[in-house]
UniProtKB/Swiss-Prot annotation:
Alphabetical UniProt keywords: ATP-binding, DNA damage, DNA repair, DNA-binding, Nucleotide-binding
This protein's name: DNA mismatch repair protein MutS
Purpose: This protein is involved in the repair of mismatches in DNA. It is possible that it carries out the mismatch recognition step. This protein has a weak ATPase activity.
Pfam families: MutS_I, MutS_II, MutS_III, MutS_IV, MutS_V
Organism expressing this protein natively: Legionella pneumophila (strain Paris)
Family: Belongs to the DNA mismatch repair MutS family.
Keyword DNA-binding: yes
Keyword check for Iron-sulfur: no
Gene (name only): mutS
């Protein structure tokens, strides 16, 4: 460090060395300043003016700054860009400091560890995720620090990792330095951490300390070592950034794929669960479902959608709770009560991290006062799940009383502003406040007492910022000043004195405000520590309120949208009567055309044909969405649904280039198809829409035929397979498990009319030119297209006929199959040769 730097800059550089990868916000008066490369980067990211302060190596030192009172807005913008920030505060007193004011980093904010309300999306989990790979295993661990959840999982394939990242959308990824990552990880803020943080023994030590155990057998130490290393690395990072204990992280939850209906990354995207195809939040499944009353419920609903359950028994407990809420007509009253509840989940996390603000505690108190009303509203409910919820939302009278006596009703935003602790809570604080606020009255009282005691009529008490408090006497009466008056200042006409009593009063008054603030801060910290003992009960309360909110919301959606409860049965199959699309139907002005569907083990595939825009993709997607909704416990848009056991949903719908990975549309399509063909089982629901379009007609049709046949006869998955290759409609003749259906359309007055009804049999034409006309293709182009189509149909179709799928058997081969060579005599063999020669000649002529 150069000695030419000022002491302040030397201090800055010392602190900055500990945070090389973070932007250091260095407090100087009313601003947070940034220097050197931090200043350049911040000026670009935040559009700040870049100035200079001092020099380093004969060059001006770049500087940029933000006002301290507006720092939260700037932090939010930086976090969205994936940046991490270290906040360095002045902790010394400028008035008494010799040299630079003492400073230290008091707060580290990273995208995955932020818990401040102002910096978070209230309706979205904020996830920090760590990845570790070893021995063909991918271990992942993730934490929602604001929600107190800590999970781990072990994977075997990169596509599984991609699916989890798409589902969780982590704000920050941790991995070991120099670890190669798949291209899809580039969409996230990645932090490379030192290798020792991914050490097995270090992970074991940290995790045992966190959960107060001697071994990790309960968390699967033997079976999931890679995931536990990731969990340990994640915990090490949290310890570094939070600089304190994490009492709200009390358990580590192992997620196992066999417990959930699996949705790969493509399926989550194609079904538009959380965002539409353009990346927006409107017109997706979540936007239709999420009418939750509180942020906790909204976040939980999204987690349910991302991880549909497989166990019918658990799903049915949710169904029973929803049925009961509907029957008792509780959805409106409960919604209104829950709407008044605070985000208890995140408040608990801030209490655990000692970063809860005064208004957090007031919001928590308001929620506690609502619990008796919510509990009373649920008195008639008898379903298993609601009974469990009732147990967790019982009142907490001692905590409620503590908060009522400790905090005023409308406190300031920050404890540093004072005026948070209620009068009467602490005698010493009340005295300090009285000294500060009643100084004038006390001064008048002291003056009168001294006059009475001394009999000096000119005696006055005064104050100025230089001399402090003083007793003033005229020159005439000064000679009568009592011995305990100590001269402080001599002026032309008066003498000023101080007494031990007045000095004591001065010390108390002048320091009362700062002492009151310090006392209040101490009391507030102690209050947070006292509330921490209620973290288990408050965490359970938060989970139960969120769960109740989701159940009430699903009950309201079922009634408002005319949805019905699906039947989950052990027998295999999928049956949907009058199914509708859950997203499209509410958006339509006209009536949605409902359609039936039935898939069973001996008839497990529907081969769907029909025109573009005729509703094939809608029919397929609504089937998958009805299945998915059934597996979160929701009612569904259908008159009746019966579902047997299912393990996965796969989709291959639509495609576009993957420019980041250098993959063409056809390559994306084939990659997704390959994953389906390798991973699907007889209990999977598979949607395949138009494969083979990105290559030649012959290759495309051959791939479509082979994929269709393999799914139907080898995998035997429940499959909806749409195609424009009409030649494929011959497949049911070869495979009895395949059924042809089509979406109806007709031509009226020269215009195509889509009927959107699914009918038995195959379409007899594709209506491609009619759809092109609707799209606005110029008439001269359409005329030329019609002429060319007629020429093709009159001569030879560019599409190979059915023989491509099942070529006609050669007469020669047919005859050869009949022969048993061991039984032929010499004469019969000679006759056969002539016969085959004759057949071959006839075949070549044809």
């Amino acid at each position: 460090m150069s000695s030419s730097h000022t002491p302040m800059m030397q201090q800055y550089l010392r602190i900055k060395t500990d945070y090389p990868d973070m932007l250091l916000f260095y407090r100087m008066g009313d601003f947070y300043e940034l220097f050197f490369d931090d200043a350049k980067r911040a000026s670009q990211l935040l559009d700040l003016t870049l100035t200079h302060r001092g020099q380093s190596a004969d060059k001006p030192i770049p500087m940029a700054g933000v006002p301290y009172h507006a720092v939260e807005n700037y932090l939010a913008r930086l976090l969205k860009k994936g940046e991490s920030v270290a906040i360095c505060e002045q902790i010394g007193d400028p008035a008494t400091s010799k040299g630079p004011v003492e400073r230290q980093v008091t707060r580290i904010i990273t995208p995955g560890t932020v818990t401040d309300e102002a910096l978070l999306d209230a309706r979205k989990d904020n996830i920090l995720l760590a990845i570790h790979t070893q021995k063909q295993k991918i271990g992942i661990a993730w934490v929602d620090l604001g929600g107190g959840r800590f999970h781990l999982q072990e994977l075997t394939e990169e596509h599984q990792l991609n699916a989890e990242l798409v589902r969780l959308q982590p704000a920050e990824l941790l991995c070991k330095e120099s670890t190669p990552l798949p291209s899809f990880c580039s969409n996230f803020a990645v932090k490379f951490r030192p290798g020792w943080e991914f050490d097995a023994s270090n992970a074991h030590k940290l995790l045992c300390e966190q959960f107060s155990v001697t071994d990790l057998s309960a968390f699967g130490e033997q079976n999931y070592p890679t995931a536990l290393i990731a969990a340990g690395a994640l915990l090490a990072y949290l310890k570094t950034t939070q600089k304190q204990s994490l009492p709200h992280l009390t358990t580590l939850t192992l997620e196992q794929s066999e417990d959930y209906l699996q949705l790969d990354a493509s399926t989550q995207k194609h079904l538009e669960l959380f965002e539409n195809i353009h990346g927006g939040g409107e017109h997706c499944l979540l936007s239709i479902l999420d009418k939750t009353a509180c942020a906790m419920g909204s976040r939980l609903l999204k987690r349910w959608l991302g991880k549909p359950l497989k166990q019918h028994a658990i799903i049915q407990t949710r169904q029973q709770a929803i049925k009961e809420i509907i029957f008792l007509q509780q959805d409106v009253s409960l919604h209104q009560l829950i709407k008044q509840c605070a985000d208890v989940e995140r408040i608990v996390s801030r209490i655990a991290l000692k970063s809860a603000r005064p208004r957090d505690l007031v919001s928590l108190l308001q929620t506690l006062t609502l619990l008796p009303a919510i509990h009373d509203e649920l008195q008639e409910n008898k379903s298993l799940l609601i009974n469990e919820i009732k147990k967790e939302i019982s009142p907490l009278p001692l905590l409620q009383q503590l908060l009522e006596t400790a905090i005023i009703d409308n406190p300031p935003m920050l404890i540093r502003d004072g005026g948070v602790i209620a009068p009467g809570f602490d005698e010493e604080l009340d005295e300090l406040r009285n000294l500060s606020s009643n100084a004038h009255e006390t001064l008048v009282k002291l003056e009168q007492e001294e006059k009475n005691r001394t009999g000096l009529s000119t005696l006055k008490l005064g104050y100025n910022s230089v001399q402090g408090f003083y007793i003033e006497l005229s020159k005439a009466q000064a000679q009568n000043a009592p011995p305990h008056f100590h001269r402080k200042q001599t002026l032309k006409n008066v003498e000023r004195y101080i007494t031990p009593e007045l000095k004591l009063f001065e010390d108390k008054v002048l320091s009362a405000q700062s002492k009151a603030l310090a006392r209040e801060k101490w009391l507030y910290d102690n209050l947070l520590e006292e509330i921490q003992q209620y973290i288990p009960e408050l965490s359970d309360l938060a989970k139960s309120l969120a769960q109740l909110d989701v159940l009430v919301t699903l009950a309201e959606r079922a009634q408002s949208l005319n949805w019905n409860c699906p039947n989950l049965v052990p027998e295999s199959g999928i049956m949907i009567q009058a199914g509708r699309h859950p997203v499209i139907e509410p958006l339509l002005q006209e009536r949605f055309i409902a359609n039936d569907l039935e898939l069973k083990p001996n008839q497990n595939m529907l081969l769907i044909t029909g025109p573009n825009m005729g509703g094939k993709s809608t029919y397929m997607r609504q089937t998958a969405l009805i299945v998915l909704l059934s597996h979160i416990g929701s009612f569904v848009p259908a008159d009746e649904v019966t579902l047997g056991p299912l393990d996965r949903i796969f989709t291959r719908i639509g495609a576009s280039d993957d420019l980041s990975s250098g993959r063409s549309t056809f390559m994306v399509e084939m990659t997704e198809t390959a994953q389906i063909l390798r991973q699907a089982t007889s209990q999977s629901l598979v949607l395949i829409d138009e494969i083979g379009r990105g290559t030649s007609t012959y290759d495309g049709m051959a791939l479509a035929y082979a994929s269709c046949a393999f799914l139907a006869s080898t995998i035997k998955a429940y499959t909806l397979f749409s195609t424009h290759y009409l030649e494929l409609t011959e497949l049911p003749k070869e495979f009895s498990c395949i059924r042809n259906v089509h979406l109806q359309a007709s031509i009226k007055t020269g215009q195509i009319v889509f009927l959107y009804r699914v009918e038995e049999g195959c379409a007899n034409r594709s209506y491609g030119l009619e759809v092109a006309e609707l799209a606005g293709i110029p008439k001269e182009v359409l005329k030329l297209a019609h002429e060319h189509l007629n020429q093709i149909q009159d001569t030879q179709s560019i599409l190979v006929q059915t023989q491509i799928i099942k070529p006609p058997t050669s007469p020669v081969l047919t005859e050869l199959k009949k022969i048993d060579p061991d039984r032929l005599t010499a004469k019969e063999a000679l006759d056969l040769i002539y016969k085959l020669k004759h057949l071959e000649c006839a075949e070549s002529i044809n």
